[in-house]
Amino acid sequence: GKSILQSSKWTYGVIPDEKRTMIANEVVGMLYKMLQEEIEVLSSHHLVEAIYSDLEEVLYKLMLAEKTYAYELSCYPEKEEQFITEYNNLNRVSLALKFMMEYVAAKPPKGEVTLGIGKYEYILAICSLIIEWAYKNDLFHYNIFNTPVEILKSDRIGMKQDEFYTIYQYGDKYRREQLYYNSSSDFHKKYTINQENYSDALDIAFQAEYGYSFTQFCRLIMGMIEYGKEREEQEVYIAPKEKLIEYIVQIDEKLSNEIAIAIIKDISLTERDDFLKVPSGFRKEDVYPWRFNRAYSFNRRPVIIRNDMIIWGNRQLYHMLMYVTDLIYEGKISTKNDKMCTLIGRISDDRGRKFNKLISDILSDMEVFVIDSNVDRINKKPVADKNGNTL
């Protein structure tokens, strides 16, 4: 708030609604400048490795929490709020770490200051605030929030928390249900949606989209993970690019040098002139750390290339593979390729039909309702909205 006031563009009091995005943009800009200044003085020596090590630790804790939540709750129901708070904090730290990693990978610092704990936490706090304010700016821009913004006499920027709390409640309820469901899946095997085998079609679509098959994509990742497993004393792995590719090609005859190089390129973050300027072929939003489902993000590109060296962690690689697979099977992966679009449409249609059957089975087993599945007409009249669109 103090920095905003010093710009002489703003004064104390409530900001007009039409200027909320303006002040949010200014806050994000100031925070981003602070981030640039803090990172550019750092030494690159072991910087990526330090961030990556923390990312691996946080991911381990997140995966553990997601697998054990239902069991922990059964044993210690009085600790539910503590579990949720810790889980949410881990997610916030993970987002900040990924943002810092994406920035450092794009703009490796050339300073001489060794990153200390205090400086590290300060930079992560800046990263977290950028994500928070930029996300709020989107909420203002799309008129999702009507919350007034006010510059307080204490030189802080204040907002009433009612709307934030309401949205948080909805998200919190969903997160708890999802955590409980995913961590107790062994207890509810009766009702499941079994996916069809799309492996052949997925290989063809992947080949058309990226120049290699999904099978080759998976095998390359498994090869890198195997390379890491042979070096169990480490958690973050560093290998010369040529040596790693030679290793993978030797243990997997299905992969060639050309394919391995192409896949590694597509799952890597590299240095570029401007962090905010997206590489060719991507949307500008793909480098915004507060946006979801970004094609050019650490979630999709957990390999860091530094000169001719490759840096990665096995947990992040495996998480990326699961993440991409989920995007495909949930119909969320961005694509302009006809074959991939056709496959995504087919998967979505199949998933919809299976979901309808699942709900029908659950209701039928209650032995209370008469269930007719896939009904599109009632008394010979189409089930449609007021515009005639079939429901």
Q: Predicted regions: what is each one?
A:
Residues 372-391:
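Active-site metal-binding core of divalent-cation-utilizing nuclease and nuclease-like domains
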